[in-house]
Amino acid sequence: MSSKNYLRVIGPPLALIAIAALSIPAGASSSSSGAVQSARAFAAGQSLNVGPKPAAAPARWLGLIGEYGPDDNVLIIFEEDGTLRAHFKSANRERLNEVSRDVFKMATSAPGYDVLTFSRDPHGRATQVTVDGRPLKRRNIEPEAGANQLRVKPLRPVPELMKEALNAKPPEEQGDFRPADLVELTKLDPSIRLEIRYATTNNFLGTVFYSEPRAFMQRPAAEAVVRANAKLKQYGYGLLIHDAYRPWYVTKVFWDATPDDKKIFVANPANGSRHNRGCAVDLTLYDLKTRQPIEMVSTYDETTARAYPDYPGGTSRQRWHRRLLRAAMESEGFTVYEAEWWHFDYQDWKLYRIGNVAFDRIPTTNR
C-alpha cells in the first residue's frame, strides 16, 4: 500500500472555504422536528463553494481509470474536466490526447512516456497499459467488480480477539470531561440514512460487531451533522452514515486484528479513538431522488491509497462529491481524517471520555 508521502507528491489537498459553524438555538434539540426545522432554516441559501457539478466522465474511459506499474513508480490514470490524464513521478496531471480507442498520446513529451496503449479484459476493464513498448500491469487495489468492500485478513481469529477485548478495560483518563450525552442521529433527523457496516458482515473484517444498526453521537456533534445534512439538500444529497459512536472494545479488536502495514486505518486502543468518544462519524452522500449511495473515488473502509482525501485518481465527479461532503462537514466544525475521506472528527472530541458502552445499554432516553 502506498504511504502518505507517495500522495503528497501531487501537492496539497484542494483548498475548501469553510462556512462558520452555526449553532442550533437553545431547545431546538428537544425533538426531532425542532432540530430539523432549525437546521433547514440556517442552511437556506448557504453555498458550500465547491463549484458546479462536473459532467460525467465518458463511459469508454471508465475501465481505464486506475493504477498501473510497480510500487516505486505508480502510474495513475484519472479523468479531469473531460480529459484523461496521467500522474507519475516525472509528470503531474499530464493530459492524454485520444488517438484511437484505447490509444493515447502525451500532450507534452515526458521521457519514456509518449504513447499509452491499454489492453482490456472481456468486461471492458483495462488489465495493463503499454507505455512506449513497456507493459505496466494494473494494480488491483480496488474491490473486484460488483463488490463494495475490501477485506483484511485478521492476524488472529476475530471471535478470539473479541473475547479478549470484552474482558479488557479502556485506558484510565484524567481530566474534567463533559458527561456523555449520546443521541441517535436518526431521531434528530429522520432524513439521515443508515448503512451501519459493523452491524453486518459487509466490513473489512467480515464480522458482525454491533447488535443493532444504529448511529449515536454526543449531542453537539449530532446536531452539527444535522446541520451539514440540511446544507446538502440544496445540492440534491443527504448523508448516509456507516458508523458513529463505537465502543472501545470494538476498536481494540480492529487494532489487534489488523496487520502492521494497515494500522494507519485503525485507532490504537491505548489512546482510544474519537469514535469511542462519540465525536467521530463515518459517512458518505446519497442521492435524494434515487435514494442510492453516491460513488466516490474509493469504497468505504478501503485500506488503500484511494481512501486518502487528497488522492488524485478517479473522475472529476467523484472528486467533486468527495469535496462537497468535506465542505459540508468542515463548515460545521468537523475535520477530515488524513487517511480516510469518509471519517470526520468533531471539534470538541477532547471534551469527552472514552466510551465502552454497547448500543443496547445506552440509556433509552437517548436512543
Could you describe each region identified by the protein language model?
Residues 344:
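Conserved metal-phosphate-binding beta-hairpin within the catalytic cores
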Residues 250:
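Short, well-ordered surface patches within globular domains
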Residues 146-242, 257-339, 348-367:
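Extracytoplasmic cell-surface/polysaccharide-interacting catalytic and binding patches
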Residues 11-23:
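Bacterial N-terminal signal peptides
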Residues 2-14:
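Bacterial N-terminal signal peptides that target proteins for export
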Residues 27-156:
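Peripheral terminal and inter-domain segments
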Residues 253-255:
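Short active-site loop/helix that positions an aromatic residue
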